From Swiss-Prot:
The gene is Efa6. It holds the Pfam family PDZ_6. GO terms for cellular component: axon; cell body; cell cortex; Golgi membrane; plasma membrane. It comes from Drosophila melanogaster (Fruit fly). Interacts (via MTED motif) with tubulin. Residues 113-192, 211-322, 339-440, 459-657, 737-780, 872-965, 1040-1126, 1544-1601 are annotated as: Disordered. This is PH and SEC7 domain-containing protein.
Length: 1601
């Protein structure tokens, strides 16, 4: 039974997170996967694996993805409140599913309520068809799959994609007895496991008990699952290979990161590692999947026999890819998935040991790997060791295994030749498709994420869409196969065309996106180049592909092994077996159409010279940052991880024939080796990871194994440890030629061959002349600097179209690393040679561009017609062409510390301090040479000028196609002065990223512009210590804000003018690496080779102001030794350096009080930050304390400003004073600390001696004793202490006050009576201007009791005459009638009496004088007043009572307490806001309550004696007094209201009522017919009686005389 509970977790010092990880789901429910020992989650004791997170800090997380939940937890405070749901049934189901999947993150769960077990049987068919009516993947009989349905995030169900149950469209392709399972990716979370019980055994094992989700036993296991943010792969697929997606990486806390598989290329054993699991020892199946795609199984070699032995040249069997730890790293708008493989399968260390996990199943325990080895690695990944890796081609698990493998290889070569050829082709294809799969695995394209938020898609569609999609797939297969066969070999072109005509309806796509070419010997022939290039350019164009479907496409076709034999042998075997291959092809249901030709992103040079066998020599896999053109070590002979950068001392060599560039390499014993550079530095593995990406292709993520620390991907940055001699790195510069495929409708193929390691081709941009809407081919390109460009073939686009193209291109950003090391002489020489070659290439390309432009204009109309036809055939599917790579060796230069200028303050690892070179390719500007020939020519000219060291003038903004991005984000030079550079003082895109990440970033305009360019950025949850930025989808938002961006950029130009002046003052220089893209050229329909211009990185040592104007260094300088600690510290964004000029200016203004008050100074000096400390130091420099005693200096200091704030704030200010005093008087005291101690003692002494409420003062001896041993262990001189004591005692310290405050105090002193009306200083003075005067006249006053009913002293009891004035609730007593004049305002105002809630009665008990009334106030004071006669007496009594009854505010309830002593309630002194009738009602209610309370009081027993009796009598007296007072109030208010009513009646009867001059001067008492006088009538009568009152005054004066 499920239950809900609430848990509060607190971060601990040992754990930056909370110690639990979530299941790798893309949406709710968010299930806790495991819990780390000694973590907050473990210490809490209430969290268990399998719990579902419902709320985080009160926020419902059912609408958020797992990444967003982890981000929320990552950014939360120290305390986080989790509301969990614990369902044993759900936990059991998840554990059951995880036990089947062998991987902790392959069960994606969307909703806790929608679980459905289903079992269905389908008949295998060689044709594509929907399974179960499009509701799910077919499963074999008696095989039940757990199906999770999700109501949202089904991006695959778009346009022509047929729906499946939460997994897009799923079809089955079967041959013979094997089932091919193809799963379309979607963001729904579903997992279906299909198992066909077939097996393959080798000599090293007997039986395999488990099959992994990513591999099927004997190729007979097929599985399907989905993942949220994947696009279908565009790679042609081989016959025997099933394309399968893999799930999106899920962020994890640093303690619980997932392992990732190594991707070191290994030899294929039975094609293992690509999608099926060969039988290995049980130890080899512990980690089953690499978390780089969706958990599916793939079948290969449909016609394979069950018991095949591995080939001689095949790699060790690789059952599956291991779970991997994942993190994310900011690379512009791309997400690089940095991953690591766990180092061992042994129990985790104490700090990361899991105490609870959903993976505690027997399947994990019974299948450890051989000798504790790691999970198998994908091709190209680094291995942590050189001897123990099970999938190292040069190291098997044991010597016996090696010998057995060799025997088996010989047997296979003799017995299975046909099968070997088939396997060779498949191995090639498997190695080819790794790049694109990893590209899709780690790239979240902005334009493709947007449809994921559109809500729930229908899970079922009719078979019509399925058949339509299959028809389109077959068409794309035909088109790609035609191109593929054309590029196989020019000599066999006609033969291939004949085969195509015969087999037109049944063609197979071969996955060749990531081909690894080999070279036997030193040289390389044209035939090899042609073969390689034909494979590379096979998937150049796939016009019939929809960009919307890319969101859900198959993701990973990668393999862990390479085919056997050399590339030439494989290609020849591939040509010979064309007919057999055609017969074996089936219609593939997965959208695996090839994309633009960036096929060979790495050039692997293989040499068999030296006579060394593959199993006899082990070399390092280079993971240091190199260029795209850097030759790789033979991956089949690599099993360790070198981390040395390559020097850029190699020059490119041209290649004839096919146009492929020869590679200059250094060989050791016939094999490729790489040495450390001259400086002995090696770069970090995190940077090596980027460079591996650059080699492997477009955004391919190459997970690397880091053996130092699994919790941080940056812990080896700038590691200065030497590598072995066998790991010396070499850099090469190879000409990079970008090609464009011709139109598919023409049936002509453009023989574009790339001579660099990054061969980039761009597809046609289908641009309709009517709408002007471009179908831009875009594919994010990840290199060491992550640069992407959009190359277009649009011929006649409007200005609006060009801007849109520019906008899309600006979505891709660059990251360039800078280091603090000088260039070596050989590097400078190589750089100069490289630049010279570049200039020559520019000139050649300029001529070609001119010729091509003329040809393109002639074919403009024809191409537009063809493009329109393609749009109709493809149903408006946009092309995704891989963009031009920069083939420069920017990584090898920029990531090496010795390649930076001396004194560069930038951190080599901090993105914020790196110089973000924002130079993009022309394609990024929408200025492809085919569509904008003149503009391309302008660009080429500017590039040439930039190479020659000159600044290129910014073109006019009105030129179509030019987009000015902030910071020159789309320009061609680092200063942003190129095309679309945005001005020399603009901020680059990457700097905008760093500023946004910086806590001090507050520039709203810059933030807006950078967000526009990047498509919106959100901080993602880093699973390690790296600071990450996740680029979200905002392509539509970018289009909408295109105009805003242009306007914002103009404003930024003006704002950066100021920054440029300041930056130019700095004397530091930076090495700025510019990454320029390639201008892809269209070859047209004539089949001519389109050779684009090659843009090579330029390394310049120019001042900061000229290269990167407006850049700011947000990281502290890195130490010269390039240590890891410094680099790690500099990586995290630190506050900006103190702006000393600003601090000096502020200190000067504070000292001169320029715009500040004295009370403002302390606030600026007492803050605990660097800037405030700098201001305080500068402020104290304005004081001169030479030859002054400490108390004199302190008095001078405190008179300048008002020292205020808390104790620690005051102490900070005094610290600066102590430092300044000791600087002015060196030697007077032992240290600054001693001065500070004595200063604080003086402050305390001043308070003690001159405090108001301190009875006992400190003596001089005590002052001396208190300071003993505080002068740095010594005593202060006694004479000094005595002099200080006497000085403070004689003259206290004076505190500075603001002038306004001083004036106010003076005014209050002059008018003290206004602030102290009466004896209570806490009561506000009345408003004299608005007060109503009720009565005045001469009276005699006698004080009987002061406040609190205390008797007045005898000296103050005497009768005194005053001129009394009643205004509102205050009775003013003056000497004469002129008391309210300004000259006499303060005269006797202290005698004023507040009469709120007062009572005036006749003093009948006082017999010494006549006409006396008693006034009792609310504070229990009592006065006697004598009037001239009885009428005057009655008038004063009634007037005072009326004012008190009408104006006094209703009382509050009395306090409640446990005291036995009676406490009178406090009565309010404010005036009432009630109307007269409401006031009367209030008094009546209060009267009733008092009467009831008095009755209750009398009913109680009367205490006999003591305090109880006193309290009883006091309370009784109070209640009786209050009853009398309220009865008087009610009586007088009732009479007043009755009189007013009668007066109104009389006025109604008599229009001109008679005057009442004869009516008595008294208020009516009881029910009388007389109208009570108003306050105005009372005043009039008082004036008439003034003459009578003057007579006693005259008599009194005579007596005085």
């Amino acid at each position: 039974m499920s239950e809900e509970l609430k848990v509060v977790l607190r971060r601990s010092e040992q754990h930056s997170g909370f110690g639990f990880s979530l299941l790798g789901t893309t949406g709710p429910p968010h299930v806790i996967y495991d819990i780390v020992e000694n973590s907050p989650a473990a210490d809490c004791g209430a969290v268990e694996a399998g719990d579902v997170i419902l709320k985080v800090n009160g926020t419902d997380v059912h609408r958020y993805t797992t990444k967003e939940v982890l981000k929320c937890l990552r950014l939360s405070e120290q305390l986080v409140t989790l509301e969990l749901k614990r369902d044993p049934k759900l936990k059991a189901r998840i554990k059951e599913q995880l036990a089947n999947t062998q991987s902790p993150h392959y069960v994606d769960i969307e909703s806790p309520n929608i679980y459905d077990y289903h079992s269905s049987s389908t008949n295998s068919s060689p044709n594509h068809r929907p399974n179960a009516g499009g509701k799910g993947a077919a499963t074999t009989p008696s095989q039940t799959g757990l199906r999770y349905k999700s109501p949202t995030h089904l991006p695959s169900l778009r346009q022509n994609s047929s729906p499946l149950l939460a997994s897009g469209s799923t079809t089955t392709t079967t041959t013979a007895t094997h089932t091919h399972s193809h799963s379309r990716n979607s963001s729904a979370s579903s997992t279906k496991i299909k198992v066909v019980e077939t097996s393959i055994t080798t000599s090293t094992t007997n039986v395999v008990g488990l099959t992994s989700p990513t591999g099927s036993v004997g190729g007979g296991v097929g599985g399907e699952a989905t993942s949220p943010t994947f696009r279908p792969s565009r790679i042609p697929q081989a016959l025997t290979k099933c394309a399968v997606p893999k799930p999106v990486p899920v962020l994890h806390s640093p303690q619980n990161k997932r392992p990732r598989p190594s991707q070191i290329p290994t030899k294929a054993a039975n094609g293992n590692g690509n999608g099926h699991t060969a039988h290995l020892p049980p130890q080899s199946l512990q980690h089953s999947n690499s978390y780089s795609g969706s958990p599916v199984t793939r079948q290969r070699f449909a016609d394979r026999e069950p018991e095949r032995e591995p080939e001689p040249n095949s790699a060790p069997p690789q059952p599956a890819k291991a779970p991997r730890f994942e993190a994310y790293m900011m690379t512009g708008d791309l997400i690089l998935n940095l991953s690591r493989t766990p180092q061992t399968s042994n129990p985790l260390p104490a700090q990361a040991k899991k105490i609870d996990s959903l993976r505690d199943s027997p399947s994990r325990l019974v299948n450890p790997r051989i000798n504790g080895a790691l999970a198998p690695r994908a091709s190209g990944e680094s291995s942590p060791t050189s001897s123990s890796s099970v999938d190292s081609p040069t190291n098997t698990s044991s010597d016996s295994v090696k010998r057995e493998a060799k025997l088996l290889q010989k047997q296979q070569q003799q017995q299975q030749q046909t099968y070997q050829q088939q396997q060779q082709r498949d191995s090639i294809n498997n190695s080819y498709n790794r790049k694109d799969s990893l590209t899709n695995d780690t790239l979240l394209m902005c334009e493709e994420l947007e449809p994921d938020e559109e809500g729930e898609y229908v899970l079922e569609e009719d078979n019509k869409q399925q058949r339509q999609r299959q028809q389109q797939q077959r068409y794309r297969q035909q088109q790609n196969q035609q191109r593929y066969e054309y590029y196989q070999n020019e000599d066999e072109l006609e033969e291939q065309e004949e085969v195509e005509e015969e087999r037109e309806e049944d063609q197979t796509h071969y996955d060749i996106t990531n081909i690894e070419t080999y070279q036997s010997g030193v040289g390389r022939g044209d035939d090899d180049d042609s073969d390689r290039q034909c494979l590379v350019d096979d998937d150049d164009d796939d016009d019939a592909y929809d960009d919307e479907e890319n969101d859900a496409g198959d993701e990973d076709y990668s393999t862990n092994s390479l085919g056997s034999g050399s590339a030439k042998q494989r290609l020849r075997a591939l040509k010979q077996r064309t007919a057999t291959r055609q017969q074996q092809r089936n219609r593939d249901a997965v959208d695996c159409a090839g994309r633009s030709g960036s096929g060979s992103s790495s050039t692997t040079v293989k040499s068999e010279a030296g006579g060394l066998g593959l199993d006899e020599t082990s070399f390092s896999v280079p993971t240091s940052p190199i260029s795209l053109s850097t030759p790789l070590i033979d991956k089949e002979t690599a099993n360790s991880v070198p981390t040395s950068p390559e020097p850029s001392s190699l020059v490119p060599e041209s290649s004839s024939g096919a146009g492929a560039g020869a590679v200059v390499v250094r060989r050791h014993n016939g094999h490729v080796v790489r040495k450390c550079d001259a400086a002995g530095f090696r770069t970090s593995k995190s940077e090596d990871h980027l460079q591996q990406i650059q080699r492997e292709g477009i955004a391919a993520v190459i997970p690397i194994d880091i053996d130092e620390d699994v919790n941080s991907s940056l812990n080896t940055l700038l590691d200065t440890r030497q590598d072995s001699e066998d790991s010396q790195s070499m850099a090469t510069v190879i000409v990079n030629n970008s090609s464009l495929a011709s139109n598919n409708n023409e049936g002509e193929q453009t023989d574009n061959r790339s001579s660099s390691s990054s061969s980039n081709s761009s597809d046609n941009n289908n641009c309709s002349s009517n709408t002007g809407e471009p179908a831009t081919s875009e594919t994010a390109t990840a290199t060491a600097t992550i640069i992407t460009a959009t190359s277009t073939r649009t011929m006649n686009c409007s200005s609006k179209l060009n801007y849109i193209l520019c906008k899309k291109a600006s979505d891709r950003d660059r990251i360039v690393w800078t280091y603090n090391a000088p260039l070596q002489p050989h590097q400078l020489a190589a750089l100069q040679r490289q630049q010279q070659q570049q200039e020559q290439q520019f000139q050649q390309q300029q001529q070609q561009l001119h010729q091509q432009h003329l040809q393109q204009q002639q074919q403009l109309q024809q191409q537009h017609q063809q493009q329109q036809q393609q749009q109709q055939q493809q149903q408006q599917q946009q092309l995704y062409g891989q963009q031009s790579h920069s083939n420069s060796h920017s990584s090898s230069i920029s990531s090496s510390p010795q390649h930076s200028a001396v004194g560069s303050p930038a951190s080599p690892t901090s993105v914020s301090s790196s110089v973000m070179s924002s130079s993009g390719s022309k394609g990024a500007l929408g200025l492809g040479s085919s569509s904008n020939g003149p503009m391309a020519a302008v660009q080429q000219q500017q590039l040439r000028e930039r190479e020659q060291g000159g600044q290129v003038a910014q073109p006019p903004s009105g030129i179509p196609g030019l987009l000015s991005c902030p910071g020159g984000g789309c320009g061609n030079n680092g200063g942003g002065g190129g095309i679309g550079g945005g001005g020399n003082n603009d901020q680059s895109v990457s700097e905008a990223i760093s500023n946004i990440s910086s806590p001090d970033y507050q520039d709203d305009d810059n933030l807006l512009s950078s967000r526009d360019i990047l498509g919106g950025m959100v901080l993602s949850d880093p699973s390690d210590s790296d600071s990450t930025i996740l680029v979200s989808d905002a392509a539509a938002h970018q289009r909408q804000q295109l105009k805003q961006q242009l306007r914002a950029q103009q404003q930024q130009q003006r704002e950066r003018e100021r920054d440029r002046d300041r930056d130019r003052e700095q004397s530091e220089h930076k090495v700025v690496i510019q990454v320029r893209g390639l201008d892809s050229n269209s070859s047209g329909g004539n089949g001519t080779n389109g050779r684009s211009e090659e843009d090579v990185v330029t390394l310049t040592d120019e001042p900061l102001g000229t290269m990167t104007v407006g850049m700011r260094d947000a990281s502290p300088p890195v130490s010269d030794d390039g240590s890891d600690v410094e680099s790690l510290h500099s990586y995290h964004y630190s506050p900006k350096a103190v702006d000393m000029p600003s601090a000096i200016r502020l200190a000067k203004r504070l000292h001169s009080l320029d715009g500040f008050k004295k009370s403002d100074v302390s606030r600026h000096l007492s803050k605990n930050n660097d800037f405030s400390r700098a201001v305080a130091d500068e402020y104290l420099k304005h004081f001169t304390f030479e030859k002054k005693s400490l108390d004199q200096a302190l008095r001078e200091f405190l008179q300048q400003f008002s020292l205020s704030g808390e104790t620690q704030e005051r102490e900070r200010v005094l610290v600066h004073f102590s430092k300044r005093f000791l600087d002015c008087n060196p030697g007077t005291f032992n240290s600054q600390d001693a001065v500070h101690t004595l200063t604080c003692a003086i402050m305390l002494l001043n308070t003690d001696l001159h405090g108001q409420n301190i009875n006992r003062k400190m003596s001089c001896a005590e002052f001396v004793d208190n300071l003993a041993d505080l002068n740095d262990g010594e005593n202060f001189p006694k004479d000094v202490l005595k002099s200080l004591y006497q000085a403070i005692k004689t003259k206290p310290l004076e505190w500075a006050l603001d002038e306004e405050a001083g004036d106010l105090q003076q005014q209050r002193a002059n008018n003290s009576a206004l602030g102290n009306v009466g004896l209570n200083p806490f009561l506000d003075p009345p408003e004299l201007a608005t007060a109503v005067e009720y009565k005045k006249g001469y009276v005699m006053r006698k004080c009987c009791y002061d406040s609190s009913f205390k008797k007045t002293p005898f000296g103050k009891r005497s009768w005194k005459m005053f001129y009394c004035t009643l205004r509102d609730l205050v009775l003013y007593l003056h000497k004469d009638e002129h008391g309210f004049r300004k000259s006499q305002m303060s005269d006797n105002l202290h005698n004023a009496i507040r009469i709120h809630h007062a009572l005036a009665t006749k003093a009948n008990d006082y017999t010494k004088k006549q006409h006396v009334f008693r006034l009792q106030t609310a504070d229990q004071a009592e006065y006697l007043f004598q009037t001239s006669d009885s009428k005057e007496l009655q008038s004063w009594v009634e007037t005072i009572n009326y004012v008190c009854a009408a104006i006094s505010a209703p009382p509050l309830e009395g306090g409640v307490g446990s005291q036995k002593r009676f406490q009178r309630p406090l009565l309010p002194s404010k005036q009432s806001k009630l109307m007269l009738k409401e006031q009367l009602d209030s008094h009546e209610v209060q009267l009733a309550q008092l009467d009831q309370e008095l009755n209750e009081h009398k009913k109680g027993p009367i205490p006999s004696k003591g305090l109880a009796l006193q309290n009883y009598k006091e309370k009784e007296s109070y209640l009786q007094y209050e009853l009398r007072r309220y009865r008087t109030y009610v009586s007088i208010l009732s009479a007043k209201m009755l009189a007013d009513q009668q007066q109104l009646e009389l006025q109604a009867q008599q229009p001109s009522p008679a005057s009442h001059e004869e009516e008595a001067d008294t208020f009516p008492v009881g029910t009388t017919a007389c109208t009570p006088p108003t306050p105005q009538s009372i005043n009039q009568k008082d004036q008439q009686k003034e003459q009578q009152q003057q007579q006693p005054t005259n008599r009194k004066e005579k007596k005085k005389k």
